[in-house]
């Protein structure tokens, strides 16, 4: 689904920015950082089963965090000490706030570690669409609130969140890096991709812009807000948003 409606005063769709978290908004894969520090020694075997397609991301995540040797506060403190947001995330959020543009983190990861990094950076107001967790009696329970009806067993869907913004009349800019971002990349109006998502887009002939940090998205959203058109959807290496530009 691509946005076709218009709901802004200018008569064009209002922009919205959605970004993956692990390896995209965050420099690191924060989930794996926590598993390396606090997880069961066999967690990488479970990850390989996921990579080989034997289990889905929801199953992989619940299995590996089931035996984590730390409580919520300990893991959040570790995230605040060791994780970092990618450059220009804060600037993009500031621009979006100043111009009434929705911006949110969309993740199949766990809410408690995402909120920890955002809190440390003073960005606790950034909306987060992730797996909601509850810590009780040494166990974690998981709640999947962002999924298509009947597909709850597959976990959260980033494509579902993209569509929910488009149904509100938004022109969606999306950034991601991995397998869980593929559905969103197909549905977003403009996609910024790196790592395995970029390869997937190449293989599937899905137009995208190369992603290194949030500079390019900031420029693209600012241009759309000013002139009423998004960037031309190009192949890597030719993107007008990939090089140096004055902010």
Residue ranges and their predicted role:
Residues 2-63:
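Active-site neighborhood of HAD-like aspartate-dependent phosphohydrolases
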Residues 58-91, 95, 99-101:
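Metal-dependent phosphoesterase signature
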Residues 18-20, 106, 175:
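Short hydrophobic segments within beta-strands
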Residues 88-102, 109-247:
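C-terminal cap/substrate-recognition subdomain and adjoining C-terminal extension
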Residues 50-51, 79, 166:
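Hydrophobic residues in alpha-helical segments
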């Amino acid at each position: 689904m691509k946005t076709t409606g218009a709901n802004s005063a200018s008569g064009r769709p209002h922009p919205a920015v959605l970004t993956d978290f692990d390896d995209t908004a965050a420099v690191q894969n924060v989930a794996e950082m926590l598993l390396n520090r606090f997880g069961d020694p066999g967690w990488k075997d479970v990850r390989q089963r996921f990579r080989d397609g034997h289990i889905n991301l929801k199953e992989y995540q619940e299995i590996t965090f089931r035996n984590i040797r730390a409580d919520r506060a300990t893991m959040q403190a570790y995230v605040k000490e060791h994780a970092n947001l990618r450059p220009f995330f804060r600037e993009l959020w500031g621009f979006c706030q100043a111009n009434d543009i929705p911006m949110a983190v969309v993740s199949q990861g766990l809410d408690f570690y995402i909120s920890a990094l955002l809190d440390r950076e003073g960005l606790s107001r950034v909306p987060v669409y992730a797996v909601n967790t509850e810590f009780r009696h040494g166990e974690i329970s998981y709640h999947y609130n962002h999924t298509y009806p009947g597909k709850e067993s597959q976990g959260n869907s980033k494509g579902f969140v993209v569509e929910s913004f488009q149904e509100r009349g938004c022109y969606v800019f999306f950034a991601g890096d991995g397998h869980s971002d593929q559905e969103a990349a197909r549905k977003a109006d403009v996609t910024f991709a790196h790592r395995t998502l970029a390869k997937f887009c190449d293989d599937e002939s899905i137009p995208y812009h190369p992603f290194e940090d949030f500079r390019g998205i900031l420029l693209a959203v600012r241009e759309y807000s000013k002139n009423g058109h998004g960037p031309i959807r190009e192949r890597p290496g030719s993107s007008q948003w990939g090089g140096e530009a004055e902010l």
